Amino acid sequence: MSETTLNAAEQPIDELVSWVKQHDFSLNLTTERLAFLIAIAVLSNERFDEELGEGELHDAFTIVTRLFEETGEASAFRANNAINELVKQRLISRFTSEMTEGASIYRLSPLAIGITDYYVRHREFSKLRLSIQLSMVAGEMAKAIEAAKQGGTAGHWKKNVYAVLKYSVGEIFDQIDLNQRVMDEQQQSVKQQIADLLNKDWREAINNCESLLSETSNTLKELQDTLQAAGDELQTQILDIQELVYGDEELEFIEETLFGLQMKLDRITSWGQQAIDLWIGYDRHVHKFIRTAIDMDKNRIFSTRLRQSVKDYFDMPWYLTYADAERLSDLRDEALVLRDDEVTGQVPLEVEYEEFQQVNDELAERIGEMLRLHKDNGKPIDLGIVLKDYLAQHPRTHHFDLARIVIDQAVRMGYSESDYQAIQPDWQAINDYGAKVQANVIDRY
């Protein structure tokens, strides 16, 4: 990005509006014109110098017009009009020189590259692409850290630290952010596909819907794992540079740049979990819709068959056998109140509250004792061990509820220094049934 563009981006809105009006900027791309522009971009990529002659543009226009027969024939007159429209909108640049004997050559403008790049190159957002971009960012950050450790004049900081952070790291972050927005669009596209399938024939569409839902869920999970792993490393690198420039008034511009990068990194890393949470909600909504549709259709089929059977009873007599059983109810409270499988029926609210409060007080006392030992002896608290020892004393059906209470009390009464250093803790088993917890050792009271 040029300094001119940067300065324009920092101007007030009214000045930017005046700038657009002064230069008479405008865009008007019909579907046919957009297809023509994309065709030019594809042909340009196949050329070493990315330049096209007028004849090649006419050929591209002919190819596009074949698929848009309703707009007219692919005449030279219409092709020239289309080319002139793109030139007027500054989507392609026209050059004429003596070397080409007066014939014009054409190149895509930066605006056209941005438009066609979105449609051509950004339609696939994969884990591989994200991994490459994150590796590039980590490499550039390592260069900036090395230059910052060496120190030097203001020119050294601007050239070897500021420039790397502002243009290399910042632009890669912007590219990742753009790709994530493309992924958001892909999710909307998948939702539209699912809606179309369910509207046509939901019975035939169930398997296809499940495939689309699972594929998107797996993709989001892989992307989030990649973001989480790389995000911690990038966070550490940003903190390292901040520590080197902290308190130096001459390097405030470095701190401002790091602050901007921190905001971008937070947005990038939070996107993955947010996308997963939103998709889980949509997944549940689709499954609920399918279950409701199945129930409704099942009842409709049954009533139709019953009416037909009654109508044909004298021709084909039949016996009716039915079974009547009590309806099973799920008594599990959404608030995660402790269950007791030995008791059936509804527990009075006073008993539920008393049982919950008793366990809560007991846990608070146990955690408080551990924290007092830490305070007196400097002994850290391993939350995984505390959970494992405590859960071993209770039935398996209580483990999930108890673990929630233990963690809630622990985070209220202490915290881990490792959390502020962006250190990713390892997973620890907390019972014999596969449950695991990921938590740093509590070492601050």
From Swiss-Prot:
GO terms for biological process: cell division; chromosome condensation; chromosome segregation; DNA replication. The keyword Cell cycle applies. InterPro entries: Chromosome_partition_MukF, MukF_C, MukF_C_sf, MukF_M, MukF_M_sp, MukF_WHTH, WH-like_DNA-bd_sf, WH_DNA-bd_sf. GO terms for cellular component: cytoplasm; nucleoid. It is found in: Cytoplasm, Nucleoid. Keywords: Calcium, Cell cycle, Cell division, Chromosome partition, Cytoplasm, DNA condensation. Its main location: cytoplasm. One of its GO terms (molecular function) is calcium ion binding. Residues 213-241 are annotated as: Leucine-zipper. Interacts, and probably forms a ternary complex, with MukE and MukB via its C-terminal region. The complex formation is stimulated by calcium or magnesium. It is required for an interaction between MukE and MukB. Involved in chromosome condensation, segregation and cell cycle progression. May participate in facilitating chromosome segregation by condensation DNA from both sides of a centrally located replisome during cell division. Not required for mini-F plasmid partitioning. Probably acts via its interaction with MukB and MukE. Overexpression results in anucleate cells. It has a calcium binding activity. Belongs to the MukF family. This is Chromosome partition protein MukF. It comes from Vibrio vulnificus (strain YJ016).
